[in-house]
Amino acid sequence: SSMNQNLLDVIVVGAGISGIGAGAHFNTNCPNKSYLIFEGRENFGGTWDLFKYPGIRSDSDMHTLGFSFKPWNHRKSIATGPLIMDYLKETIDEYNLDEKIKYSHHVESANWDESECLWEVKVLNKKTSEKFIYKSKFLYMCAGYYRYSSGHEPDFQGSNDFNGQIVHPQKWPESRNYEDKRVVVIGSGATAATIVPEIAKKAKLVTMLQRSPTYYVSRPDEDKVALFLQKFLPKRFVYKLIRFRNVYLQQLLFKRVRA
């Protein structure tokens, strides 16, 4: 395969929420610096584009999950996956990031060259199979922590003898029909807490299995304080105010439960 060399100031790996945020900051604060965002998949969004399971939504409010520089203007502060994708697309358009994102470009390796004081990054164009070597002063790893090829699947004894369907949320077929069926959800983490209420609307019976007891807090998906303040104050100011409040309350809760 042919190897072409390119020199950049910054290389960003991943066009999910972190990579898009990094690009927006570069365009705003470092407009004269050169950079590219390499995304191995064919679309932006990362987790929010990959996961298609029922009820996919943010686990935290969008005032804290969203960007500090771009207010979240929807009524619901707990957002669905499609709404988050819209938010990210707006950010890409507003900050002209499309020309910076290289889709279907998989980063194969990254090595620090001590002699040149540069990162040497090998990139594969998955569509053409052509390989490139890029060099940069800085490397931003925004690839997240999920393995996109397959999710974690424990080896359950006897699973091969099970006559029903075993579905992993990470590879949930959009055509999956669970109406009037009995469903067992293994685990009680954020994904399970999202899926169970949604499939319970149509399934005959839904049972969640958990190994360790946990606490659930019932919270509204609309922030009434934020909606009230937006009637009198600029939305950008309200967004920053609610963001500060929520971060403070989350830190306070975290410290209390550890006490």
Predicted regions: what they are:
Residues 47, 111, 218-219:
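Short Asp/Glu-rich motifs
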Residues 1-2:
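Short, Lys/Arg-enriched N-terminal segments with co-localized hydrophobic residues
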Residues 75-147:
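Feature captures the FAD/FMN-dependent oxidoreductase FAD-binding
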Residues 66, 103, 109, 166-169, ...:
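Structural signal for conserved beta-strand scaffold positions within catalytic alpha/beta enzyme cores
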Residues 42, 72, 106, 112, ...:
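Residues that form or immediately flank small-molecule/cofactor binding pockets and catalytic motifs
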Residues 6-7, 11-12, 17, 21-43, ...:
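Rossmann-like dinucleotide-binding core of oxidoreductases
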Residues 8-13, 17-101, 210-211:
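Beta1-alpha1 glycine-rich phosphate/pyrophosphate-binding loop at the start
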